[in-house]
Amino acid sequence: MFDLGTSKFRGNILIILKKIGIVLSSSALSFGMYASVTSASITENGQPEKVQIQVASTDTVFSKNELIKKFREAFPKRFDFLTDSDFQVGGSHFFPDDKQLRHDLSFTKTINGKRLYGNVGFVGEDLEIEHFYYQPSNTAEALFPAKTSKEQARKIAVDFVKELDGGKEYQLESDPFNYFPKQILTEPVRYSFSFARTENQVTILDQRIEVSVLGNGEIITLYRNPSNSDTSTFDDVKKIKDKNEMLEKVKGNLSAELRYQIDYDYQTDDRQVQLVYQPTTKLRGVHASTGKWLTANGYSADFPVKTKIEKITANPLPPKQDGITLEDAKKIAEQFLEINSDKVKLSIQSVDEIENYNGQAVISIQYMYNFASSGHGTTMEINKNTGEIIQYNDLKSQIAEQIGEKPYIENTLSNREALAKAVKYAKEWAPSYLHNFAMPIDEAYIEERQGIYHFTFPRIENDIVVMGDQISVGVAADGSLNSFNVNYQEIEQWPSTDKVVSEEDAKSALKKALSLKLTYMKQEKNEDKNHYDLVYLPEFYEEPFSYLNANTGEWNSSFQGGKLAVISHPWAEKELNYFISAKVLDIKDGKDFNGDASVSKGEAIKIIMNSLTYIYDGRYYSGNENKNQTFDNIDPKHPLYQAIERAVEMDIIQPDGQTFDVDSPIKREELAVWYIRVLGLEQAAKDSSIYKIDFADANKVRTEYIGHVALANSMGLLKTEQNHFNPDREATYAELAVSIIRLAHKMTEKAPGLGY
């Protein structure tokens, strides 16, 4: 739905964020400090998407013309250039837990040789738009510097939401956090805005609208949670307890818990471990009317008690097997994936040995269930050295539901029975890991519709919980294994607790940063599924993804969002600052940066590659990245290895020796050569005899590069100054920034959407 480039990382991040979007997109981002380990694992271990139940075309309620009419009403005059024949109707479907019928409509058209595309999803009898995506045929005006400013885009989004839901009140929230590491310059500028629906001027947690506006002013994405506003009921806002009173109540019960936090840099594959303090994890909020504590199990008059840490097994257990082959792994997978249905056929697509992002040698089995004219598949991973399961998700219940073979299942296991099953599966399929993990310290998450229990067994080191590392086990209503995921990162040395601030000091810092946000939210344990409770949600600090550093007692941010350096320059200020905001240029301190300083060849190629392509150096992506070594002095451990090897692959750098001088300054003439090669015009530039350059310093241009310089100048990439090209002058950061942006525009003119 979103154009996020070709990177596997960006796709995976989007999936994760989609699953936890309700929490992350709310203004209570720092509520994540209170989120339990259980919640984190459930959202991140890749649980399957919702099952779509297809509806026969004969049962479709709305015609194509009705859908087109509703679409045009939502976007008056915007798509008048489309004819009815440009639209196509997709299938209708519903979800098992939401019987509202959904209809899909798409459109495509070619204008001046360029194709545009879009789709829209409607839900319910009123054909409420649930999602919308539009890919225009021309995005030139959306490239930096964009035609539409952020302020103008904000007004466009606000006006659109007002028209979309005239009778409902939506509140524009603060700018959403930039989750992605960088954006290449051939991608158009996008502005994202988040709106929360309100009732009695209080935001509703699960009623949101997300809108993206392109840099040319066009609305390109919309997503909103479908609502049953006609049947929803809400707590009386006049009956809530005083906010300050509740705040003091929370502070009085607050405790600080020491945790290990692993920060993983996917680009370098480095892992840094630090000690952090986190508040009581079992508390979700406080009911605003009764003052009861909200936990995973509902409301309680008693504050949730901290669970004592208990190892699954005190001593190491032997691995399940002493290494397995690809054929062994395939047999294990077939045992897990076997499905008892004549309507479904299992197909093993591939069995490969890979190294996962935790550095483990695993065997990856890609498989597909084929049924009717559809199919559904995913990947299973098995540890090559131990034969133990690393990742498994059962799709069989979903498949059965799609083909109508499995009825609604009531929960038939008690929590205790399901936990015993989960421990049994952990001992059977990951025995060699278990001495590093503890019994669940948080309540199980229960998918009540299917009766599935999800348990999280946290990793323990030095009697301290390791945040993010866990074994996640899902147990189905019939006691079968529904999901299994082991996240275990190899860490050589764990920080000592000798120099951490005291628990009391940490608790004081948490209390100082704590605030409460009044929110309407549904409580899963409530029998009335349409009722919204008023809840005070805890918030810490103002920075999203913030944490309390246990060694300094200070607040830090995992991503340092909103704290980018800002620099000044007489003629390239906006370009340089855009490079910084797009994470193309890494500047720690704007005061020390000199935009007129010379750029080395190594730094120049790094900036060019970061501007035009997505490069990931980490182990998890190494299967898709370069493994060759072109230059003796640039081995795979060199920080510029991927950038230089990618430049060689793209013929930007054409090796003429055994080494590459990363430290020597890049001259303007050399920069012109690189740019022309980026555009694929190397052959056109090589015949220097057909080019005439009349610069005052034309004699300083090397003969073999006359064509490159002539083209770079005529295309406006590198311009003359007082009729001097200055081919042997060292290029500066400012020149590089301005000229690369021009290059990005030329690239999109040549091939819209081009990105390496």
PLM feature segments, named:
Residues 53-91, 145-184, 233-266, 314-352, ...:
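Short, non-transmembrane alpha-helical segments in secretory-pathway proteins
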Residues 75-124, 172-215, 260-292, 339-385, ...:
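Exposed beta-strand-loop-beta-strand "reactive/processing" segments of non-cytosolic proteins
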Residues 196, 207-212, 222-225, 458, ...:
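A structural feature that tracks compact, well-ordered secondary-structure segments
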Residues 2-5, 9-41:
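Sec-dependent N-terminal signal peptides of Gram-positive bacterial secreted proteins and lipoproteins
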Residues 33-38, 555-573, 586-602, 609-641, ...:
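Feature responds to low-complexity, polar/acidic, surface-exposed segments characteristic
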Residues 53-61, 140-148, 235, 315-323, ...:
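Second-shell loop/turn segments in exported
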Residues 110-155, 162-170, 203-241, 282-310, ...:
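Extended intrinsically disordered, low-complexity coil regions enriched in Ser, Thr, Gly, Ala
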